[in-house]
C-alpha cells in the first residue's frame, strides 16, 4: 500500500489545439465537487396512539460544479529550441509559463504558432520585445469548451500515481499579488463540470518550467498614476508601493438542470460582468505628488461623479532584459484612499479598471518582458 504526497503534484492543461501544457503550481492547490441535497422532514402533533412521527429523508438533487484553485508564479521567458513548444513558435519570442491560463481566462479557444486566439483573432501576441495579452476577445457568453485540467499525484514509492481530470474547466478569476517581500504570484480559480479519474497526458509544451532565472521580484515594482486631462484632478502621482493586488474576474455561473428523479449534472457555464479591480498600498508620504497629495486631491473631488486615471503597474520594475510584468489600465476609477494607523502610517487605494465605453474591452492590457 502506498500513500500519496501532495507536494509531488503536476498540473497539465489540455483540450486546446491538441496541445498539452505542463504548469508548475504552488502549495495550497485544491479541487472538489459536492452534492446538492434536499431534506424532507416530518413534523406533526401526537396522534391517538401517542406517536409523533419525526423522521426525515434525503434526496440527491444535483452535482455542484467542480471548484478548483491553484497558484503559479509569473514567469516570463524567451523561447528556445531546448524545450518542447508549439510548431511555428519562434525562438527568442517572449512567452510565459502560465500564458495558456491567461488565454483561457480571456476567451481564447485556439493556439497557433505560439499565440492564443479566439477563432482567428488574437488574445495574446508574442515577439522579441514582449508578450502582449489583450481583453479584446473577452466579450463572449462562454469560454473555451473541452478544456481539461489534470492533476497528477504520484505515490510515495514512485510506482504509480493518481490522475484527477477536471472536465469542462473554465477559469473564473486571476488575482496577482505583489507583496514586496515575495515573488510575483498569480492565484487562479474556476469551475468545471465533473471530476473523473484519468491518466497523465503527454506534455507537448513545457518551455522554461525548470528555469530558475525567470521569476519576478516584487520589491522592484513601480507605479505610474496620471489623472486624465479631462479631470479636475490634474497631474501625475508617484507612489512607492509596499504591496498590492490586481484581480481579473469573469463572474461565471454554471448551469444545472433541475429535473426530478435524477441526479442532475452541470451542463456548462455562462460569463457574467467582467471586472478588473485592485488595491495599492504605500506609506503616507508628504513628498510632492505623493500619497498625501493623492488623498487630498480625491477628497476635494468628491463632487465629481467619476474620476479617471491612467494607471501603470510595473511588477518587477522597468529594467530591460529582466523578468517583469506590466498592467496598463488607462481608465481607472479610484476610491478615496483609506488610512491604516500601524507603527508607520500607510494608505490603501482601491480602484476599478474600466473600459473607455461601457461596451468596450480596453480596461486593461497585460505585457510580459524577459
Model-identified regions with their sequence ranges:
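Signature of extracytoplasmic/envelope-associated structural regions
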Residues: 1-370
Amino acid at each position: 500500500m502506498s500513500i500519496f504526497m501532495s507536494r509531488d503534484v503536476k498540473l497539465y492543461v489540455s483540450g486546446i489545439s491538441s496541445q498539452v501544457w505542463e504548469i508548475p503550481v504552488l502549495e495550497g492547490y485544491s479541487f472538489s465537487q459536492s452534492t446538492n441535497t434536499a431534506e424532507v422532514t416530518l413534523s406533526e402533533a401526537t396522534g391517538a396512539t401517542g406517536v409523533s412521527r419525526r423522521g426525515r429523508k434525503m434526496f440527491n438533487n444535483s452535482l455542484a460544479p467542480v471548484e478548483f484553485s491553484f497558484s503559479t508564479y509569473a514567469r516570463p521567458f524567451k523561447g528556445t529550441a531546448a524545450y518542447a513548444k508549439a510548431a511555428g513558435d519562434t525562438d527568442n519570442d517572449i512567452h510565459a509559463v502560465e500564458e495558456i491560463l491567461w488565454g483561457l481566462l480571456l476567451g481564447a479557444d485556439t493556439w497557433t504558432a505560439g499565440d492564443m486566439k479566439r477563432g482567428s483573432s488574437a488574445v495574446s501576441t508574442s515577439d522579441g520585445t514582449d508578450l502582449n495579452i489583450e481583453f479584446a476577445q473577452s466579450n463572449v457568453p462562454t469560454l473555451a469548451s473541452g478544456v481539461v485540467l489534470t492533476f497528477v499525484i504520484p505515490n510515495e514509492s514512485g510506482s504509480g500515481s493518481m490522475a484527477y481530470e477536471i472536465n469542462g474547466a473554465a477559469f473564473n478569476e486571476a488575482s496577482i499579488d505583489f507583496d514586496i517581500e515575495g515573488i510575483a504570484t498569480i492565484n487562479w480559480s474556476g469551475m468545471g463540470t465533473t471530476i473523473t479519474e484519468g491518466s497523465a497526458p503527454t506534455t507537448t509544451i513545457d518551455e522554461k518550467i525548470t528555469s530558475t532565472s525567470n521569476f519576478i521580484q516584487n520589491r522592484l515594482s513601480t507605479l505610474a498614476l496620471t489623472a486624465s486631462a479631462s479631470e479636475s484632478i490634474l497631474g501625475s502621482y508617484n507612489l512607492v508601493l509596499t504591496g498590492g493586488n490586481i484581480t481579473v474576474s469573469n463572474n461565471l455561473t454554471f448551469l444545472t438542470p433541475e429535473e426530478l428523479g435524477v441526479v442532475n449534472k452541470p451542463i456548462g457555464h455562462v460569463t457574467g460582468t467582467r471586472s478588473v479591480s485592485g488595491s495599492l498600498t504605500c506609506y503616507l508620504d508628504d513628498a510632492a505628488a505623493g500619497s498625501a497629495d493623492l488623498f487630498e486631491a480625491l477628497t476635494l473631488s468628491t463632487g465629481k461623479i467619476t474620476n479617471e486615471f491612467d494607471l501603470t503597474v510595473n511588477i518587477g520594475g522597468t529594467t530591460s532584459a529582466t523578468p517583469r510584468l506590466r498592467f496598463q489600465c488607462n481608465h481607472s476609477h479610484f476610491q478615496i484612499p483609506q488610512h491604516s494607523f500601524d507603527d508607520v502610517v500607510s494608505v490603501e487605494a482601491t480602484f476599478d479598471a474600466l473600459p473607455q465605453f461601457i461596451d468596450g474591452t480596453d480596461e486593461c492590457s497585460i505585457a510580459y518582458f524577459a
